[in-house]
Each structure stands twice: as C-alpha cells, then as structure tokens.
C-alpha cells in the first residue's frame, strides 16, 4: 500500500481505507469479520471504514449471507462494478487501442483501430487516440462508470515519473510529451480536475498485467521475481523484483532489444550493431524467413497479422520461416542469459508476439539458457528459472495500462472518490 499522510490520525485512516479496499478487491467477496481478520484490525475498527467505502460507492453488499447463520443482507462485501474505471491506451507501431477496466478487474469497454504510426507525427496519432478515448468513456458512462485515470503504453523509453516519450525508435519519436496532445481527452467536460495521466513503456505495463492477471488456464501464478519479455516490431523487457518493477535510475531499464548479441552484426536504428532486434524482431524474422517486411505489412495489416502469418508458415513446415524462428530463439536465449545470470529471476515470461511464436522459439531459447546460465551448474536445476508463455499475449500492455490507471483508487480511496464523496477529515 502506498504510504499516505504520515502517522497522523487522518493519514492512518486513509491507509486503512486503502487496506480494506485492496483486500476486498483481491480476495472478496468477504464478510466484515473476514476483512478485519485479514488486515489485523478489530471488527469495531473496520466497521466505519467499510461504511465509508460503501457510502462512496466503492464497496457494495452482495446480499449473500455470511457463514454460520442467516446473516444479514449485504453481509458479504465486494468491490463495486460501478463508479471508477481505469482507462488504458496503447500506441503501437501498427495500431491504437483503448480499454476500460472496473474495480472488479473486468474489461467493460474496448476499441482498437489499425494505424500506420511508424514515423508518423505525434499530433495526428494522439488526435486519433483521443477519438478512441472519447468512444470508450462515452460507452462506460452509460453503465455508471467514470474514468479514474488514464495510462498510455508506448514502445519506447519514457522519462521516469513524467509523460514524455524520450525515444521511441519504431515510432520515430524523440522528446514527445503526450500530455498536451491528450489534454482534451483527460479534461472532463463537467469542469472537474483533469484525469491523472501516466505514460509508461509497454513492456513494463505487460509485466504489471502479468502480476495482476497472470497464471490461470493451467499455468502457475507468476512469482514475485521474473523477467517479462514483450515483442512485436521491437523487443522490450521488464524486470520484476519482489513484486516491484525495477526501473533504473532514469526509468530506462529493460531495453533488451538493444542488447548486443553479435557485436559485429547488422546496424540497428538505435545506432548500435548486432542488437537482439536485428535477429528476433518481427521485421528481422520476416526478412530471414523470405518474407519482405514491407510487402508483408501491406498484405497483412493490423496488429498481430504478420505474427499470424509467421505462425501459419511455420506450422505448414516452411523451412525458411522455421529456421528464422530458430535463429530468433537462439539470439533471445543469448540475450536473456545475461539477464538471468545477473538477476537470478524465478521465471522468464514471454509475452506479446513471442507468445504466438513460442512453439518454434522456445526450444532454441531454452537450450541457450541451459548452456549459458548458472543453472547449468545445478544438476537438479532446482533453483533455475522456468520459461513460460503469457496467456495474455499481445493484450498484456493494454490491460496493464488500465490496471495501472485504476491503482490510484486502490492506493488512496479517499482522494479518488473526492468528487463524488467528500468525507470529513
């Protein structure tokens, strides 16, 4: 929980409100006694906190009786499916997408559009994104939801704690502040304060989605220490240590795509040579597989289309494509081996485009990890990382953005519900 308000009575109350809301959001529906037990407060101490969250519309009574008797209506508590919603947006090289997620974690609205954003001026891109944002906010308003914040996923370096894209090579952007271009989308028409805006690297938001939504469908839940790899045109990574993103001094940690795999390899747009993206990026794999990237993009527009083409060709036994994917897995394994040796994660999670190509990438990737990491010195490999494929796939960054936008409500319910509910201090 974010530290709020110091140790004053007001600050303690705000922290406890957050603890109650977060506990019910993560584990509910729960009875009041169960909430008290989980956060270590007395029932009498929890009661006014619950009442305040009920008045604010952040919690609701389910009407389901608690165990051990008939109970009373609303005896169990759940987070509301109305009220605040997190708005997530994604700016991709070939698409734009927006979604809204409620406190229960359900996607309540989603729109996407093909968009040729590569080397496009930021202004028109943000104008199109603003139109999609207006569409989503209008849709959720009809369901009793209001935006609590906006988070935007971008494929590039983002200044830590700022809204400026420092460099996004695959978009062709440098030093672009998204706040002015999205001002119309973040300023509510009723004159209330502008929505909080977060801009974040897409791989970091993919990792956040993995923390919140990963596992399930027969997969183990992600550990608290893992490396999340996300790829489409470019390749990014996010490092999670003890459940928190490792951002680096400037917020640039995780630029896996520009780790040199073969120092004398082909030139990269970043100015280096032999970068991972030159072997495992989408365009590199298309080229190595005998599919001209430009023609493939024209014939198969839209997010995921070229990845689908590669997967189909590989499944049909196209030798050149299978070989290209094998090379991509080898290069990815070499790059990840350094990260694994340095960080000792419990898992490596493949997301984005890599998830759809995993059957052909994993064998060579895992071989390189076994050869090049300290795991090879452990005969039982008991402590080594496992490599898993995210079930979220290419949806991870967008979902992570929406959940990031909603986090402010969970961290500080008192402030977040202030426009609709102004409790006494």
Task: Give residue ranges: language-model regions.
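ATP-binding/phosphotransfer module of carbohydrate and carboxylate kinases, centering on a glycine-rich
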Residues: 1-74, 78-112, 118-146, 187, ...
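Phosphate-binding/catalytic loop of phosphoryl-transfer enzymes
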Residues: 89, 146-153, 157-284, 400, ...
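A short, sequence-level motif marking secondary-structure junctions
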Residues: 115-116, 252
């Amino acid at each position: 929980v974010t530290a709020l308000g110091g140790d004053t009575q007001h600050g303690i109350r705000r922290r406890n409100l957050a603890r109650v809301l977060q506990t019910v959001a993560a584990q509910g529906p729960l009875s009041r006694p169960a909430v008290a037990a989980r956060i270590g407060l007395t029932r009498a101490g929890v009661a006014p906190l619950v009442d305040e969250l009920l008045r604010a519309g952040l919690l609701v009574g389910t009407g389901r009786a608690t165990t051990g008797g008939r109970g009373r209506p609303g005896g169990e508590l759940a987070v509301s499916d109305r009220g605040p919603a997190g708005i997530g947006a994604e700016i991709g090289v070939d698409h734009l997408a927006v979604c809204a997620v409620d406190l229960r974690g359900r996607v309540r609205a989603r729109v996407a559009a093909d968009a040729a954003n590569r080397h496009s001026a930021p202004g028109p891109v943000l104008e199109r994104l603003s139109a999609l944002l207006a569409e989503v906010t209008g849709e959720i308003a009809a369901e009793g939801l209001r935006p609590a914040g906006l988070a935007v996923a971008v494929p590039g370096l983002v200044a830590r704690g700022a809204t400026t894209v420092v460099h996004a090579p695959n978009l062709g952007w440098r030093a672009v502040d998204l706040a002015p271009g999205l001002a119309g989308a973040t300023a509510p028409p009723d004159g209330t304060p502008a929505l909080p805006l977060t801009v974040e690297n897409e791989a970091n938001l993919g990792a956040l989605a993995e923390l919140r939504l990963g596992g399930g469908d027969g997969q183990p839940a992600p550990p608290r220490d893992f490396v999340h790899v996300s790829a489409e045109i470019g390749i990014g990574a996010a490092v999670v240590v003890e459940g928190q993103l490792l951002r680096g001094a400037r917020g640039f940690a995780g630029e896996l795509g520009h780790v040199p795999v073969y120092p004398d390899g082909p030139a990269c747009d970043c100015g280096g040579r032999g970068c991972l993206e030159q072997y495992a990026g989408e365009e590199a794999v298309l080229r190595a597989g005998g599919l001209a990237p430009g023609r493939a993009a024209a014939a198969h527009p839209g997010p995921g289309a070229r990845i689908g083409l590669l997967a189909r060709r590989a499944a049909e036994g196209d030798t050149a494509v299978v070989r290209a994917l094998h090379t991509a897995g080898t290069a990815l394994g070499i790059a990840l081996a350094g990260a694994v040796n340095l960080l000792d994660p419990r898992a490596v999670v493949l997301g984005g485009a890599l998830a759809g190509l995993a059957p052909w990438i994993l064998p060579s990737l895992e071989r390189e990890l076994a050869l090049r990491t300290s795991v090879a010195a452990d005969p039982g490999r008991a402590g080594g990382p496992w490599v898993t494929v995210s079930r979220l796939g290419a949806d991870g960054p967008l979902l992570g953005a929406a959940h990031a936008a909603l986090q402010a409500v969970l961290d500080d319910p008192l402030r977040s519900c202030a426009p609709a509910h102004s409790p006494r201090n």
